[in-house]
Design a protein with these regions (language model features):
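Cleavable N-terminal export/targeting peptides
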Residues: 1-25
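Transmembrane beta-strands of outer-membrane beta-barrel proteins
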Residues: 26-34, 77, 89-91, 133-135, ...
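Outer-membrane beta-barrel "beta-signal"
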Residues: 35, 515-529
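Surface-exposed loop and membrane-interface regions of Gram-negative outer-membrane beta-barrel proteins
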Residues: 38-74, 78-131, 135, 143-153, ...
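Signature for the C-terminal beta-barrel architecture of outer-membrane proteins
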Residues: 130-135, 148-357, 404, 423-425, ...
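C-terminal outer-membrane beta-barrel translocator/porin domains of Gram-negative envelope proteins
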Residues: 341-343, 347-398, 404-407
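Flexible internal linker/loop segments at domain or repeat junctions
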Residues: 367-390, 428-460
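Exposed, low-structure sequence patches enriched in small/polar residues
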Residues: 389-392, 397-432, 516-518, 522
């Protein structure tokens, strides 16, 4: 309760100062969010490799031992101090998530959580006089562009500076510097002598949106450098069957974001004849992404949109490098009763060589408030909380798929529905499964294999060309009042996993994998003000 008091005391002081004569207009908005989720089979396992019942579920692509039914709440509170049309400051508090009954999150009897109040965003917006330039400085939400699909490379809160200039109504330019990490390395091995040294991670973005009659196009590029100490210490452990696993330090208080750095910028498994400290890069990692996204609405009510992205990361060792691409095409038709659409996507996948790096598209972070329009169960279809999302992963990396959907399907006032049906498969070589599961602890040249993932569902889903799946969503939104909404989500996922690829360890004792379907029912209640 102490931190709650601090938040509302700050609000009172700000509003009180405004009354003393400052020409500042204070605005408050936010939302109370409640989620009641039931998920069955959220990790797609009935029994694990050892034949034991596998509990828990995947949420936002990471295994968590969570109950099948959960009740969760969260409060978003945004304060805006507006001095003029050209100057304003914003602070965005997030209180929760709080799982009902969980003491550590303040949801147990007494409700005294000690770490639930977080500053999600805090920035200043400024426009110089007589210029069409907009500057945003501070902790802010950044979402790279995507017209067909929410961008699968970066979508998160981050510290940085954004500058946008409009040359005219048709053409603009946006530049952005972001600093995801810095000064987090403790260097315990050297008594802290070189702590916080070479551990910065910086990204630079350039966007050039073009708006014409009936068409919008946005080419964009992002480049960056990551210090060799950013994710230290690197840890290698011996696993069953003489295989090895690797993990990195997690410099983020949001564990999911930190784990995504490992999963998004490095291979799922690699092989090397090196050992010890020489296994890793000692210089800055460099990275680049380039994309082209757009939509055509000239033939309204028919709309076509597309995305294309290429990305590469050089981690200083061939086996640690990663490069890949992604493309998607969407066509939809707007009617009085809904918006039916067809779409298809393709992400490049790994080949069968763990020594030449990864061929999957690299990414940085895509969890925070992600609205992935592909689905609301396998991925995060709505920017609302709840455990019933992201069981396939944070994005469809390493997959291809086709789908059909109907958005805004409505036959009565204040009630709308979304229906999605997706059929998808993996684009990774089936031989990679043997390295990921530890069945093959060495590559064909006798080099040791180090694996980040440990199974098809250890961090998101790693699907091969021998695997496929089907997902069905039916989601309904009822607007009970101007500020009150009820959202009911239902979802079902079936995976066809190739038994020859994933079914049994060859060198490790254990039963064959027993996988199961996943399904959910989730009710969200949102009061927005």
């Amino acid at each position: 309760m102490r931190k709650w008091g601090i938040v509302f005391l700050a609000v009172a002081l700000l509003l009180g100062d405004a009354a003393t004569g400052w020409a500042v207009d204070f605005k408050v908005k936010g939302s109370w969010q409640f989620a009641f989720d039931y998920i069955n089979g959220g990790n797609f396992m009935g029994k694990n490799r050892q034949g034991s019942h596998q509990i828990g579920q995947q949420w936002a692509a990471i295994h968590q031992k969570r109950d099948e039914f959960e009740a969760i709440q969260r409060l978003h509170l945004q304060l805006q101090a507006v001095a003029s049309e050209s100057l304003a400051g914003v602070v965005f508090f997030e209180i929760g998530e709080q799982r009902w009954g969980m003491s550590a999150q303040g949801g147990a009897l007494g409700a005294d959580g000690s770490n639930m109040v977080k500053v999600k965003q805090a920035y200043v917006d400024w426009m110089p006089p007589h210029a069409d330039l907009k500057v945003r400085m501070g902790l802010q939400g950044v979402r790279l562009p995507g017209f067909a699909l929410d961008n699968p490379v970066f979508n998160d809160d981050v510290a940085g500076i954004t500058a946008s200039y409009a040359f005219n109504k048709s053409f603009g330019l946006t530049a952005l510097w972001m600093r995801p990490y810095n000064d987090n390395w403790l260097d315990t091995a050297d008594n802290g002598v070189t702590a916080d040294y070479l551990d910065n991670f910086d990204l630079f973005v350039l966007l050039a949106p073009v708006s014409l009659d009936g068409m919008k196009i946005t080419p964009w590029a992002m480049a960056g450098g990551m210090g060799p100490n950013t994710l230290k210490p690197f840890t290698v452990r011996n696993a069953a069957g003489n295989s090895k696993t690797f993990t990195f330090n997690n410099p983020s208080s949001q564990a999911i974001d930190g784990l995504q750095m490992r999963d998004g910028l490095f291979p799922a498994a690699f092989s090397s004849g090196r050992g010890g400290a020489s296994l890793w890069n000692t210089a800055y990692s460099t990275m680049f992404w380039g994309g082209l996204t757009g939509e055509v609405t000239a033939f309204s009510p028919f709309r076509v949109s597309w995305d294309f992205i290429y990305g590469s990361v050089d981690n200083g060792r061939e086996y640690l490098n990663r490069q890949g691409w992604f493309g998607m095409l969407l066509g939809e038709y707007d009617t009085d009763w809904g918006v039916p659409g067809l779409y298809g996507w393709y992400f490049s996948g790994d080949d069968d060589n763990p020594h030449n790096g990864s061929e999957r598209l690299p990414y940085v972070a895509t969890t925070n408030n992600l609205t992935n329009s592909l689905s609301s169960f396998g991925y995060r279809g709505h920017p609302i909380m709840g455990g019933g999302k992201g069981v396939l992963g944070t994005n469809p990396n390493g997959t291809w798929g086709v789908g059909a959907r109907i958005k805004r399907l409505s036959f009565m006032d204040d009630l709308s529905h979304t229906l999605r049906v997706n059929y998808f498969g993996g684009t990774n070589d089936p031989k990679m499964a043997a390295y990921i599961t530890g069945r093959r602890p060495m590559d064909g040249a006798g080099r040791a294999v180090y694996r980040n993932n440990t199974d098809f569902n250890s961090f998101g889903t790693y699907l091969t060309r021998s695997d496929s799946g089907l997902e069905i969503n039916f989601d309904s939104t009822y607007k009970a009042a101007e500020n009150l909404s009820f959202i009911l989500e239902t979802g079902y996922i079936h995976l066809w996993l190739d038994e020859g690829t994933w079914g049994r360890y060859e060198n490790i004792a254990g039963d064959s994998l027993n996988y199961k379907d996943a399904w959910k029912v989730s009710l969200n209640v949102i009061y927005a003000f």
